[in-house]
């Protein structure tokens, strides 16, 4: 179910924030969010539960926590200013929400890069049904 929802949202939001986050991920990891991260582990993609499976999944868990602190922002749809230059992601000036969302995405993309050496292809299309147990606190 999570996979179908993500694909539907990405098709609708071709010019939206999710495309920006994908560009950051690709810039840092050289991998497209779909298929490499959109369905990875228990937290990469829409929603999440249980314990993160590894360092990559933990990046997504922390990203979810970051978004959780922005309850009054439209984290899935706000478009924010940013640039990709000289090996760095730089968030630009925008509304408070845009700047915070950009920072959440920047930090997550950089975390995914740092976790590349432990990426496990076995978690790439991990079924939600295997994500059990209590979720960690942010």
From Swiss-Prot:
SMART domains: PA2c (SM00085). Its EC number is 3.1.1.4. Expressed by the venom gland. This is Basic phospholipase A2 canebraxin B. The active site is at 63, 105. InterPro entries: PLipase_A2, PLipase_A2_Asp_AS, PLipase_A2_dom, PLipase_A2_dom_sf, PLipase_A2_His_AS. Belongs to the phospholipase A2 family. Group II subfamily. Keywords: Calcium, Disulfide bond, Hydrolase, Lipid degradation, Lipid metabolism, Metal-binding, Neurotoxin, Presynaptic neurotoxin, Secreted, Signal, Toxin. The keyword Hydrolase applies. Pfam families: Phospholip_A2_1. Its cofactor is Ca(2+). GO terms for molecular function: metal ion binding; phospholipase A2 activity; toxin activity. It catalyses: a 1,2-diacyl-sn-glycero-3-phosphocholine + H2O = a 1-acyl-sn-glycero-3-phosphocholine + a fatty acid + H(+). Disulfide bonds join 42-131, 44-60, 59-111, 65-138, 66-104, 73-97, 91-102. The subspecies C.h.atricaudatus mentioned in PubMed:15032748 is currently considered invalid. However, since different origins of specimens explain sequence variations, the specimen origins are indicated under strain in the reference section (in PubMed:15032748, Iowa also refers to C.horridus and South Carolina to C.h.atricaudatus). SUPFAM superfamilies: Phospholipase A2, PLA2. Heterodimer of an acidic subunit and a basic chain. The acidic subunit is non-toxic, without enzymatic activity and comprises 3 peptides that are cross-linked by 7 disulfide bridges. The basic subunit is toxic, has phospholipase A2 activity and is composed of a single chain. Binds 1 Ca(2+) ion. Gene3D superfamilies: Phospholipase A2 domain (1.20.90.10). GO terms for cellular component: extracellular region. It comes from the Eukaryota. It is found in: Secreted. The keyword Hydrolase applies. Ca(2+) binds at residues 43, 45, 47, 64. GO terms for biological process: lipid catabolic process. Residues 1-16 form the signal peptide.
């Amino acid at each position: 179910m999570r996979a179908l929802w993500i694909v539907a949202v990405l098709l609708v939001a071709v010019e939206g924030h999710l495309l920006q986050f994908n560009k950051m991920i690709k810039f840092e990891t050289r991998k497209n969010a779909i298929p490499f991260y959109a369905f990875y582990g228990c937290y990469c993609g829409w929603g999440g539960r249980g314990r993160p499976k590894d360092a990559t999944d933990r990046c997504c868990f922390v990203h979810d926590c970051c978004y959780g602190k922005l309850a009054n922002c439209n984290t899935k749809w706000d478009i924010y200013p940013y640039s990709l230059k000289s090996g760095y992601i730089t968030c630009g000036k925008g509304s408070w929400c845009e700047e915070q969302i950009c920072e959440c995405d920047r930090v997550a993309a950089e975390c995914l890069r740092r976790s590349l050496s432990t990426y496990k292809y076995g978690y790439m299309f991990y079924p939600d049904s295997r994500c059990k147990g209590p979720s960690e606190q942010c």
